Amino acid sequence: MNTLNARYGHTNLVARDWRSLAAFYEQHFGCVPVPPERDYRGPDLEAGTGVPGAALQGAHLRLPGHGPNGPTLEIYQYQPPLEGLPPVVNRPGFGHIAFVVDDVPSAREAVLAAGGRPVGEIVTLTTATGSKVTWVYVTDPEGNVIELQSWSK
């Protein structure tokens, strides 16, 4: 049941350097910028975010595999910034974003070479339906957790 008539729109990542992080997702995952770049500030933003003096810049990136009207990854850089906690996969709230890739080990190496960090080891699990998923957690250059996964029968 969808009593709100809702549909998925976007996931937001708050970045330290939004341009660099957007370039990472464009280059390594095929995300595509959706113009225009965002630049918001003023009383409405402060009221909406509850952050006094809030200002943000950033962009929306179309996620791969969903066509020209699919959901986006919204990457914003806020002023003033608030430093975060170290990345972990089991903290309540945003856990990770997952991308299906052809080759998990190669994708892992590419992410690490681009400034990401390892979180866990590559593993293959068999699901209840008998499918196999090979996956690993890494971080992007700013510490956001990414799951790289590949499926087989």
Predicted stretch roles:
Residues 1-4, 13, 35-36, 73, ...:
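Vicinal oxygen chelate
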Residues 60, 80-81:
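Amide-forming acyltransferase catalytic core, primarily the GNAT-like/NAT-type
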Residues 42-47, 81-86, 125-127:
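A short, acidic/glycine-rich surface segment
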Residues 64, 76-78, 151:
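Generic beta-structure capping elements
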Residues 14-69, 106, 113, 129-131:
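Core segments of cupin and vicinal oxygen chelate
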Residues 70-73, 94:
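Short, structured motif recognition centered on aromatic/hydrophobic residues
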Residues 5, 53-55, 90-91:
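Short, low-complexity disordered segments enriched in Ser/Pro/Gly and basic
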Residues 8-10, 92-96:
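Eukaryotic phosphotyrosine signaling hubs
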